[in-house]
Amino acid sequence: IIDKFPKEYEFIIAIGYKGDSVREYCELAFPTHKFTFVEIDNVDGYASGPGYSALQCKSYLQRPFYIATCDCLIDSPMPHLDGNWLGIHPTSYPEKYSTVQLSGNDIIRYSNKNENGYDMAFIGLAGIWDYGVFWEQLEDNIVEGEIVSAFKTPSNYPTFKAKKLKWLDTGNLDDLNKTKEYLNDKPLSLQKDNSEITYKEGNTFIKFTPNKSVLDNRIIRAKELGGKIPDNFKYTNNFIS
């Protein structure tokens, strides 16, 4: 999803569980991008959730901004930040998703995981133009840490549009496998039975190695090989590149 945005954009990333791995990967894969990582103090306790995490990032987002949840991919161009909008995709299972009712391209009603909801699902991608309204709505209506609490009453925003996008969900194992099949496993991510994963970003290969002793031995070997390996070899606590 990072590749969908201009390189000069700033990315505010909330991190918690496995946050070090997220930070290390982003910095290896996108060394020229500007990232700000916000460590969330409550990732699994009472009232934790995407909305709570977003509020921890509030001070960095006092201007129009995009929201992208970590399990959302799209096979569409990134819409412009030209107003308040939600990315949507048709669904037959309103009980599984936050859904919206439309009048043309205007969002007029919202429902959260209700079998009596609507046929357009919020995909986890949004443009927030009236950020003051967003923060006010989130703080006033947040339930169980949900970020979608900010969209409970669409009429509280000056305008709220829908953007229909080709959504690739990765929020559960079945959808993740479908997405990998759809993308032909691109960008390359070769996962082994030992939980190692190799990623490819541009011309850079990045290997995630959860076994610390294996990783340390590879780093030692790379140093001993010296000039026999590429001179841009890098390593972190979880990766080699």
Write out the residue ranges for each language-model feature:
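ATP-binding glycine-rich loop module of kinase domains
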Residues: Q191-R221, P230, N238
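Conserved core of the sugar-phosphate nucleotidyltransferase
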Residues: I74-I147
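A cross-family kinase active-site recognition segment
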Residues: S241
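Short beta-strand
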Residues: F160-A162, D231-T236
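Conserved beta-loop-beta/alpha segment of the NTase-like Rossmann-fold superfamily
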Residues: E27-G104
